[in-house]
Curated annotation (Swiss-Prot):
Keywords from the named record: ATP-binding, Cytoplasm, Kinase, Magnesium, Metal-binding, Nucleotide metabolism, Nucleotide-binding, Phosphoprotein, Transferase
Protein name (Swiss-Prot/TrEMBL): Nucleoside diphosphate kinase
Keyword Ligase: no
Organism: Chlorobium phaeobacteroides (strain DSM 266 / SMG 266 / 2430)
Cofactor: Mg(2+)
Length: 140
């Protein structure tokens, strides 16, 4: 089983779409093995997205991710990373495929409802940022 990390971003929480997006995730065959509602500070958002520090959108991303609560989750499924990225769609909702999370719910490239890890290696690192081993509940 492969794992991936997702974050339901502040726009998702503000729009009261946690249930709708979580339902779509579960219907796609993912198991949620860790989940919590939290709020990132500018510092923690900056740490999480440090890989983008030199990119022009970094400041806006940190501001947005610290603007309200978010819901990180660890998901488990065969081929989890690729399947989840297909489920959520392109970063820009205008380019996302019909029926994807971002096409359905996102307003813009900057406020695009959800984060999804881009590799199994990054998923493990990102999961460790939000969850301790004790918080991960394996479902049989």
């Amino acid at each position: 089983m492969e794992r991936t990390l997702t974050i339901l971003k502040p726009d998702c929480v503000k729009k009261q779409l946690i249930g709708a997006v979580t339902d779509k995730i579960e219907r796609a065959g993912f198991r949620i093995i860790a989940m919590k509602k939290t709020r990132l500070t500018k510092e923690t958002a900056g740490e999480f997205y440090a890989v983008h520090r030199e990119r022009p959108f970094y400041g806006e991303l940190v501001e947005f991710m610290s603007s309200g609560p978010c819901v990180p989750m660890i998901l488990e499924k065969e081929n989890a990373v690729a399947d989840f990225r297909t489920l959520i769609g392109a970063t820009d909702p205008a380019e996302a495929a019909e029926g994807t999370v971002r096409k359905l719910y996102a307003d813009s490239k900057g406020e695009n409802i959800v984060h999804g890890s881009d590799s199994a290696e990054n998923a493990a690192i990102e999961a460790g940022f939000f969850f301790s081993a004790e918080e991960v509940v394996r479902v049989n």
